[in-house]
Amino acid sequence: MTRQNAYSRDQLLASARGELFGPNSGRLPNDPMLMFDRITEINDNGGSHGKGLIRAELDIRPDLWFFNCHFIGDPVMPGCLGLDAMWQLTGFFLTWIGAPGRGRALGCGEVKFTGQVLPTATLVTYEIEISRVINRKLVMAQSDARMLVDGREIYAAKDLRVGMFTSTENF
């Protein structure tokens, strides 16, 4: 598939099935772990580092699966799901630029949570700025990211790392 600068939910789910970039390319997780509904912008020269920018959105609805179990009587989106979305998007970037293999989160330097996503919210926006791409024996991207709920930043992460592996048997 030719690289696009935006992707619909159907296209993201095709990525989960290995149909968007091919069966041997990196994949996004399928529902319910896919943590965004669309990528509204992706490029390989934007962001504050000039190495790539991804913007994505998740529509918040009270019936989202995590509100029913986290927590009963006090529903809130788990912070780890927002962090995972940042890793998902960083990995998608690597697949989008043609890096071979399957993506795996390798860590992050710093994470801050300064708010929460409640069922009354309407929109989560992710902004991922690629700070480094290594494309040698090790294929890895490093990024800085933030997550906004209804326009207010509530999560920030620095030095997110995702690697691509042609074999994950010994990972």
Curated annotation (Swiss-Prot):
Documented EC number(s): 4.2.1.59, 5.3.3.14
Superkingdom classification of source: Bacteria
Isomerase among keywords: yes
Keyword Isomerase: yes
Active site feature: 70
Keywords in alphabetical order: Cytoplasm, Fatty acid biosynthesis, Fatty acid metabolism, Isomerase, Lipid biosynthesis, Lipid metabolism, Lyase
Cell compartments where the protein resides: Cytoplasm
Main subcellular location: cytoplasm
One Gene Ontology biological process: unsaturated fatty acid biosynthetic process
CDD domains: FabA (cd01287)
InterPro entries registered for this protein in UniProt: FabA, FabA_FabZ, HotDog_dom_sf
Pfam families: FabA (PF07977)
GO function terms (MF aspect): (3R)-hydroxyacyl-[acyl-carrier-protein] dehydratase activity; trans-2-decenoyl-acyl-carrier-protein isomerase activity
Gene Ontology CC terms: cytoplasm
Pathway: Lipid metabolism; fatty acid biosynthesis
Catalysed reactions listed for this entry: a (3R)-hydroxyacyl-[ACP] = a (2E)-enoyl-[ACP] + H2O; (3R)-hydroxydecanoyl-[ACP] = (2E)-decenoyl-[ACP] + H2O; (2E)-decenoyl-[ACP] = (3Z)-decenoyl-[ACP]
PANTHER family cross-referenced by the UniProt entry: 3-HYDROXYACYL-[ACYL-CARRIER-PROTEIN] DEHYDRATASE, 3-HYDROXYDECANOYL-[ACYL-CARRIER-PROTEIN] DEHYDRATASE
Function: Necessary for the introduction of cis unsaturation into fatty acids. Catalyzes the dehydration of (3R)-3-hydroxydecanoyl-ACP to E-(2)-decenoyl-ACP and then its isomerization to Z-(3)-decenoyl-ACP. Can catalyze the dehydratase reaction for beta-hydroxyacyl-ACPs with saturated chain lengths up to 16:0, being most active on intermediate chain length.
NCBIfam families referenced in this protein's UniProt entry, alphabetically: fabA (TIGR01749), PRK05174.1 (NF003509)
Assembly with partners or alone: Homodimer.
Family stated for the protein in its record: Belongs to the thioester dehydratase family. FabA subfamily.
Protein's name in the database: 3-hydroxydecanoyl-[acyl-carrier-protein] dehydratase
Lineage: Bacteria, Pseudomonadati, Pseudomonadota, Gammaproteobacteria, Lysobacterales
Gene expressing this chain: fabA
